[in-house]
Amino acid sequence: MTKKHLTETRFADLALHPKIQQAISSAGFEYCTPIQALSLPVALSNRDVAGQAQTGTGKTLAFLLATFNRLMQNESSEKTESGPRALIMAPTRELAIQIAHDADALIEHCGLKMGVIYGGEGYEGQKEQLAAQPDILVGTTGRLIDFYKQDLFSLKDIEVVVLDEADRMFDLGFIDDIRYLLQKMPDPSKRLNLLFSATLSYRVQELAYEHMNAPTKLEVEPLQKTATRVTEELFYPSKPEKFPLLLTLIEEDWPDKAIVFANTKHGCEKVHGWLVANEHRAGLLTGDVPQKKRLRILEDFAEGKLDFLVATDVAARGLHIPEVTHVYNFDLPDDCEDYVHRIGRTGRAGASGAAISLACEEYVYNLPAIEDYIGHTIPVTKYDGDALLSDLRRPRPIQRRRRHNSGGGKGKPRGRRSGPPRNAS
């Protein structure tokens, strides 16, 4: 979240614990984002929240502040079990890690302990976290249930429960796990329940009313599905021209930090191969990439060691990557909601961004549903096929292994074009 003045609501005017106010002040935050301004007064009065908000709107800080405040206000609560006082559930391990990272300043000032539990990593280090009896536990449902069934922690002392990106948990099939964990906790009336979702669909609302205590439904600009600061652009390439067009647009835009989406793992591998072959610093993020390598790729991308991240929707969902300037939809997504999630990676918290989509003959049929969902047509840009980059290096054939390499070299792409491709007659 940036330090921009996004609403008239100041953190200093909210009923937050003094140590939390110190943490906010030290981080340089003064004004709330819209979702924070709506949800915090409700949550700080110990009322449940079901909030609709995209990633990048400041919702993570909103539920972290509410969680820490509840625990700090009830410091005298005596734990009767070897379990946490708050549980934050996330759909992906990357999101769980990011949530814990975002809580660092609060942990430093408040003195509460946090543990992070997720799959894809060894058990021993996470068991040590549980042995330290954290006040707040962040995790993915599968590993949480695994450790719970081993009696490594209890849920009987839960005072706050957070469901982040609830819609994605449905998409990934985690809803039964969520219900299992919620049923092991105290009654909803005895805890603070916070749910955040990019969409408050019927099934998400059903979950909220089933396991929450009369939640207040909050929506941030529900009719504005795409960010107003994101410039959208659509091209109609033929299949053979998709890679040359993508690489030409990248050279023309020369983005500081960009994410390229493809619909399949193999599609991502091909895009990544073309980028690396033409000397772009790119990382590949699919479900097959081992966890430690995923974290290294994300760290390199965040630190500017990589300029491009090539990803599938499932692999990228829930990631909090700041300062993404461009999103390229190499394929138009099959799910119209994924289009919104993709382009929502840029233009966050007051910044501007660009979303460029390629509608080839294979995926162009997804366009009507996308435009109907977002409520507007995407501006079309014509291009001159003769102006595309020539003499591009073709990637080496992909070797089918259980693990795929990612990364890239430095430098500019080869084969200068004769002129700009955009707005050609």
UniProtKB/Swiss-Prot annotation:
Any one Gene Ontology cellular component term annotated for this protein: cytosol
Motif stretch (DEAD box): 164-167
- Sequence ranges assigned to domain Helicase C-terminal in this UniProt record: 242-389
Q: What PROSITE patterns does this protein map onto?
A: DEAD_ATP_HELICASE, HELICASE_ATP_BIND_1, HELICASE_CTER, Q_MOTIF
Q: Please tell me where ATP binds in this chain.
A: 53-60
Q: Which reaction does it catalyse?
A: ATP + H2O = ADP + phosphate + H(+)
Read off the Pfam families from this record: DEAD, Helicase_C
Residues of the Helicase ATP-binding domain = 40-218
Q: What is its EC number?
A: 3.6.4.13
Matching InterPro entries: DEAD/DEAH_box_helicase_dom, DEAD_box_RNA_helicase, Helicase_ATP-bd, Helicase_C-like, P-loop_NTPase, RNA-helicase_DEAD-box_CS, RNA_helicase_ATP-dep_RhlB, RNA_helicase_DEAD_Q_motif
Q: Where is the composition biased (Basic residues)?
A: 395-419
Q: Annotated region Disordered: where?
A: 391-425
Enumerate the GO terms in the molecular function aspect. ATP binding; ATP hydrolysis activity; RNA binding; RNA helicase activity
Family indicated by similarity = Belongs to the DEAD box helicase family. RhlB subfamily.
Assembly and partners are described as: Component of the RNA degradosome, which is a multiprotein complex involved in RNA processing and mRNA degradation.
This molecule's function is given as: DEAD-box RNA helicase involved in RNA degradation. Has RNA-dependent ATPase activity and unwinds double-stranded RNA.
Q: Which PANTHER family match?
A: ATP-DEPENDENT RNA HELICASE RHLB, ATP-DEPENDENT RNA HELICASE RHLE-RELATED
Could you identify this protein by its name? ATP-dependent RNA helicase RhlB
Organism of provenance: Idiomarina loihiensis (strain ATCC BAA-735 / DSM 15497 / L2-TR)
Primary gene name: rhlB
